[in-house]
Amino acid sequence: MLRKSKKQPQTVAEKVSKLLAHPNESDSAEDSDFDVATGPRLVDFEEEEYDLPDARSTDFRKRNVKLLSEQSDRYKGKISSRKELDDDEDKDDEQEVSYEESDEDDENLTNFKQKLNAGGAEDSEEETAAGHSESGEESEEIESNLTDFKKKFEAGDFKYDDDEEEDDDSEEEDHSQESEGDDDDSEDDEAEDDAIKPSDVMSKTNHQAEIQKGLAVQNQLRIWERLLELRINTQKFTSKANQLPAPETLTKLASESDELQSVLNEAQERSSKLLQQLLSLQSALHQQYSEMKKSVKRKQPTEDSGPAVKKFGSVLQSNFQQMIGYRNEVLLKWDDRTKLLTPGAGVKRKSLQEDYDIIKKIGSALANREALVEKSQTPKNSQAEQQENTPVQRLKHIYDDSDFYHQQLRELIEYKASTSSNMSEITKQFVELQKLRQKMKKKVDTRASKGRKLRYVVHNKLINFMAPNESSDWTDASKSELYKSLFV
């Protein structure tokens, strides 16, 4: 059994009266549920639960932010002393005193007006009480003079205020014009700063440092020329040494002749003395150069029992092993610097081998060591061992590097031909170098980021590979009937 609702139904009159008394309320449960379901839901805000995000600036922004003084000259400060600061304070005090005096002057003017008005009234009362002792014309003149004076005074005061306002307006206009002029000047200055000329860049550099770099480069070139000159002078006796017989035949001839033995001993002593001097020079250079002294750790050579030639060989081998690390660092450093000056440095390489550094290139060149040694032990056409009809033979007791020697000579000739003291040619080379550097710079469109510029690729036109659809009114039956009628 369902229970009957205890709530009695309301009449129409009761509903209308309730709506008139409370128009915003609804008595039905359905309306209230509808309002709850469709009405806006509000959540209480609690400050403790809500945490603001961390809006601190990053280190990158701090480093790249520009001060106002760097952006425009208007915001640059001026260095002042304490004396100037005290003078400014005294000027401010004087201005305050002048303002106070002007207030006192205004009060005096008002008092003077009141006295004039009071004096005029008293004079008129005395004249009437005396029974018109003076003539009416004089009294009228006095009154007219007083009224004229009052009018002139008031008119003069009004004009003075107008002049002040006009002066203030003119000063404001002048100030606005000056500020606009300053803005224009600042914009012009900023535009001039943005358009930096190459001469300005060259003038801002440290000339003394550039001079020192130029002198260092000249010293390096002189050292290279002296070493190449030494190599040219040694070419004569190296070619003569390669013409000597093999060591076995030379020892056999020396055993037969005492004079030849003494000559060989003297040559060995002189060559060993020369080699000793070169090693001492190398150690002195290591001690003199601080960077090499830190990078190259010298080891004391072990005393080997044996002939002097073997001792020299072990010392040279140990020195070479110690210098490998420093040599690679120097080669990589200068190879990276010279890559920027070579033409076509910014162009993509066709092969992966061209992207190798200088160390990998040297390693790949020395990979086939046996072939290189055989090439250096093969006599060339300029030597006497090789005759016209005899085949080329490998002689292990000689060392021929004429290919490398001729390459060095070609480099020396090209360097002497390219270098000149004429300033016009030097400026032309400098301009060509600047053009080359500008070409190597990658042109980047700064406005194309963040989706501000659409990037698209134009596709080729569509090609239709379908068979053509014939639009003909003839049916197959009519076509076959036509073909049959042709061969009747």
Curated annotation (Swiss-Prot):
Family to which this protein belongs: Belongs to the AATF family.
InterPro entries cross-referenced by the UniProt entry: AATF, AATF/Bfr2, AATF_C
Job description of the protein: May function as a general inhibitor of the histone deacetylase HDAC1.
Organism of provenance: Drosophila melanogaster
Pfam families: AATF-Che1 (PF13339), TRAUB (PF08164)
Post-translational modification Phosphoserine, affected residues: 26, 28, 32
Gene: Aatf
GO term, biological process aspect, one: oogenesis
Keyword check for Disulfide bond: no
Protein name (Swiss-Prot/TrEMBL): Protein Aatf
GO cellular component annotations of the record: nucleolus; nucleus
Biased composition (Acidic residues): 86-108, 160-193
